[in-house]
Design a protein with these regions (language model features):
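Extended, well-folded interaction surfaces typified by the phenylalanyl-tRNA synthetase beta subunit core
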Residues: 419-423, 427-583, 723, 770-774, ...
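A carboxyl-terminal module marker
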Residues: 2, 445-448, 458, 598-601, ...
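Phosphate-backbone binding interfaces of nucleic-acid-interacting proteins
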Residues: 1-208, 346, 364-365, 369, ...
């Protein structure tokens, strides 16, 4: 959101010593995050008013004229210009040397300098509207027309920024920081906060209502839970014309574009007090009645942007006695919009509930400045502010206008929240003892009404904060702390008393697994969204019958909640292959499956959700990455102090290669899988010219040991000897069988590689392992080493018919 400080200063007189930098810091620390501070006058640097004194023909160019121009300095300057509407006495826009403009309104900015045009010296440039950001203020009839300021109150030498009000500072506010503050979606709300921060008075807005004796405008609300208030004013003798320059500037600096005076009034009011308005052309309304109702089945509505929508019975619409005119709180219809022949309007100032607007907006993918504000939950009292300001502006801009009818259907006023909070609670939570007067003063500056009795503060929350923002004592505490300033509270550790030791084996196991994969196995952890692109779900061949579909997905293709982490991992791999050929990634996260997980309230209806762990290695050599990942799983239990996992071939995962896969089991129950990803799955995921080994585990089924007995082993006094052995084994023999035998005969054994080549007989494979040998009584001799190796080979040959591979 953009906030104009010139606009804010209409409502509050800020201390003169407060700089823009200090103001943005204070606002960030106490209310909302200011992302940027923009000086709007910078783009008008060296762009001023000039008055044409002479207009002469160019001696060498029929379309150019040589002008003498008064720019407010001692002597006039000569400027060559091709404008079609130049005349003596005309006030024009001059870009002096050093100014930056869009040449003929196109391309990049060009810096003006003194030059010669067809042999004639030219000091600067007489500008058209599109060249100096003025097309909204002075719409040009053709590209050769220059801006005529003769009707504007200005004199030669005046800076254009001062003339149009662009001598302003605009604050860019992070929208996320005011999501729960509907009162701040207007300049008056920001002014109210600054008034409280700097302890200066806020100028009260005058509430003006139409005369009670005028004709009553008939308003019917069918569902008062969706529309707690609807006001309408019928105004005659208004027509389409440009709004005043000051209003156009305010709207521009607020982040919108001026359109015409009628529409600009509605937008100005919305940006001023945060209350959306809408104007209907009164001549196109059938019957003297407005009906707020749910759409009927089969009804359609052509919106302002000529987008035709098929309404549902859940959509709230504004209707005349014949048909829908607008999608309530979101966008008006084309039929009743303001056009060039408009002579009267019906002005809507209403309140709609947040959920109603949010659901309809998502259904039709419509988000407007009005709907954004309604989605934050506006209080009904703000209708009075919006209506009053709008009527004042119509009278100012259209002195001849006439209010001929007014209606206000107000069934559900916003109720003030009442929150009681004890002095003791505030003292403990703040970590600093404030006096009763300090607390009352702080809250009253924010609009609270406060009574203190028997150590209890009874606070009546203002309506603009009573729409879900402030509802409990912690909210009141937060308001006190932020307004005083968090930096003035000394940080103190929370008092914690343990009556017994805390043992959370699952939490510990989760941390160990993350550390094992990241630090020991060199994986990078990734985090993906719970909703998954259906492209990757289909690629992984996952059955979606048990998947949960979102009613209002972030986008059409992201409509399913994940039931496995593998599709998300495929997407991560697809994106990262643009930058890396080989990498390792893992994720631990929740997945969701249809069905009720545990007893809960009817409102919750929680699905089954469980935590899974998945990891992948990406590389060119399929066999190498598979065995690397297999080693990661085999060492998982050892390094993470949990019950042993076993690997076997029982069920092929849907995304797996036909041959290269293993199931991971614990206590004879399959809890996961390890496999190479099939070529078809990779192709459908947009992954080519690489291989992927992937595993997925049910974290909830992993069982950490409850306790362990640590046995201390002295560091070896004598050096260990490493030796690699390449063994010729039957293809059916697994590494686990070899490891179980060798590990009992050596200090340490590890798998190096498996090889199948031309020199390997059919039905055989070569496995290379590394053993570490040692003797506690001294350094091993060559003879001792050879004797130990021969013993290992004899046992392997006897048990598994394994021989040493001959080179």
């Amino acid at each position: 959101m953009r906030v104009s400080l010139n606009w804010v200063k209409k409502y509050v007189d800020l201390p003169k010593e407060i700089t823009n930098k200090q103001l943005s810091y204070d606002l960030t620390m106490r209310t909302v995050e200011v992302e940027d501070v923009i000086d709007t006058s910078l783009k008008f640097h060296d762009i001023i008013v000039g008055e044409i004194l002479e207009v002469n023909k160019h001696p060498d160019a029929d379309k150019l004229k040589v002008c003498m121009v008064n720019i407010g300095e001692e002597s006039p300057v000569q400027i060559v210009c091709g404008g079609s509407n130049l005349y003596v006495g005309e006030k024009v826009v001059i870009s002096k040397p050093g100014a930056e403009v869009y040449w003929h309104g196109e391309g990049d900015l060009v810096k003006i300098k003194e030059t010669k045009m067809r042999g004639v010296s030219s000091y600067g440039m007489i500008c058209g509207a599109t060249e100096v950001y003025l097309e909204d203020y002075f719409p040009p009839k053709d590209e050769s027309e220059i801006v005529d300021l003769s009707e504007v109150d200005c004199k030669p030498g005046d800076n254009i920024a001062d003339i149009i009000g662009m001598n302003d500072t605009v604050l860019e506010i992070d929208n996320k920081s005011l999501t729960n503050r509907p009162d701040l979606w207007g300049h008056y709300g920001i002014a109210r906060e600054l008034s409280a921060i700097y302890k200066v008075p806020l100028k009260e807005l005058e509430i003006i209502k139409p005369d009670k004796n005028i004709k009553k405008y008939n308003i019917e609300i069918k569902d008062t839970t969706k529309c707690p208030r609807y006001s309408a004013v019928e105004i005659n003798n208004v027509y389409v014309k440009p709004s005043p320059i000051w209003m156009q500037t305010a709207i521009t600096n607020g982040g919108m574009r001026p359109i015409n005076a009628i529409v600009d009034i509605t937008n100005y009011v919305m940006m001023a007090v945060g209350q959306p308005l809408h104007a209907f052309d009164r001549t196109h309304i059938t019957g003297e009645k407005i009906i707020v109702r749910n759409a009927n089945k089969g009804e359609k509505l052509l919106l302002l942007d000529e987008n035709s929508i098929d309404l549902t019975t859940d959509d709230l619409v504004i209707c005349d006695t014949k048909e829908p005119m607008a999608l309530a709180g979101i966008k008006g219809g084309r039929k009743d919009s303001i056009l060039q022949d408009t002579t009267g309007v019906v002005l809507e100032v209403a309140d709609f509930t947040a959920g109603t607007i949010r659901n309809t907006g998502k259904r039709f993918d419509e988000k407007t400045d009005a709907s954004i504000r309604y989605e934050k939950n506006i209080d009904t009292e703000r209708v009075d502010l919006g209506l009053s300001l709008a009527l004042q502006l119509f009278k100012e801009i259209y002195p001849e206008c006439e209010i001929i009818a007014y209606g206000d259907n107000y069934p559900n006023p916003t109720k003030n929240e009442v929150v009681e909070v004890s002095k003791e609670f505030l003292d403990i939570r703040l970590g600093k003892v404030l006096t009763v007067e300090e607390i009352k003063d702080t809250l009253e500056r924010l609009g609270y009404k406060v009574e203190y009795k028997n150590n209890i503060f009874k606070t009546v929350v203002p309506t603009w904060r009573s729409t879900g923002d402030v509802s409990m004592k912690d909210d009141v505490l937060g308001d006190i702390a932020r307004l005083i300033g968090y930096e003035y509270f000394e940080a103190k550790p929370l008092p914690v008393n343990f009556t017994s030791s805390v043992n959370q084996p699952k939490v510990t196991l989760e941390r160990r697994l993350r550390e094992y994969l990241a630090y020991r196995c060199n994986f990078n952890e990734v985090f993906t969204y719970p909703w998954i692109d259906e492209k990757y779900i289909k690629a992984a061949k996952i059955d979606t019958s048990t998947s949960i579909r979102l009613a209002t997905p972030p986008s059409p293709e992201l409509g399913i909640l994940r039931s496995s982490l593998v599709p998300g991992m495929l997407e991560v791999i697809s994106k990262n292959l643009r930058y890396f050929d080989t990498f390792r990634v893992f994720e631990m996260a929740e997945v969701f499956i249809k069905g009720k997980y545990h007893e809960s309230t009817e409102e919750e209806v929680l699905p089954i959700h469980k935590k899974l762990l998945t990891g992948a290695i990406v590389g060119k050599n399929a066999k190498e990455i598979f065995f690397e990942l297999k080693g990661v799983i085999e060492n998982l239990s050892r390094y993470n102090h949990m019950e042993e996992l076993t690997l076997s071939r029982l069920e092929k995962p849907s995304w797996s290669d036909k041959e290269v896969y293993l199931n991971i089991s614990l206590n004879n129950e399959i809890i996961g899988s390890l496999s190479l990803v099939s070529v078809s799955t990779m192709n459908e995921s947009g992954i080519k010219r690489t291989n992927i080994a992937i595993f997925e585990l049910d974290f909830g089924k992993l069982v950490p040991f409850k306790s362990r007995t640590n046995k201390f082993n002295h560091l070896p006094q004598f050096p260990l000897v490493e030796k690699d052995l390449s063994l010729l084994v039957d293809s059916s023999i697994t590494w686990k069988e070899i490891n179980d035998i060798v590990s009992t005969m050596v200090k340490e054994v590890s798998f190096i590689e498996e090889y199948n080549g031309d020199k390997i007989p059919e039905g055989k494979k070569s496995i290379t392992l590394r053993i570490k040998l040692g003797n506690n009584n001294g350094t091993m001799t060559t003879e001792q080493i050879n004797t130990r190796v021969e013993k290992i080979l004899k046992v392997l040959n006897k048990e598994l018919n394994i021989t040493l591979r001959e080179e």
